[in-house]
């Protein structure tokens, strides 16, 4: 699974707990978008999570 190139957000692992308290493994995956960004004056493609896109931690290349 892809990881955010800006904040290094990655997959989290945990347990799904039913009403009868049975536990099974589950994962939480980040919302990753592959977009073009401007870095050091040049454009490149990067894997960026939507949290970083919303908070303007990266400038998009149009």
Curated annotation (Swiss-Prot):
Annotated Gene Ontology cellular component terms: ribonucleoprotein complex; ribosome
Record bears the keyword Flavoprotein: no
The entry's keywords: Ribonucleoprotein, Ribosomal protein
An MF annotation (GO) of this entry: structural constituent of ribosome
InterPro entries: Bacterial_rp_bL28 (IPR050096), Ribosomal_bL28 (IPR026569), Ribosomal_bL28/bL31-like_sf (IPR034704), Ribosomal_bL28_bact-type (IPR001383), Ribosomal_bL28_sf (IPR037147)
Pfam families assigned to the protein according to its UniProt record, in alphabetical order: Ribosomal_L28
One of the GO BP terms on file: translation
Family as reported in the entry's similarity comment: Belongs to the bacterial ribosomal protein bL28 family.
NCBIfam families: L28
Official protein name in the record: Large ribosomal subunit protein bL28
Species: Acetivibrio thermocellus (strain ATCC 27405 / DSM 1237 / JCM 9322 / NBRC 103400 / NCIMB 10682 / NRRL B-4536 / VPI 7372) (Clostridium thermocellum)
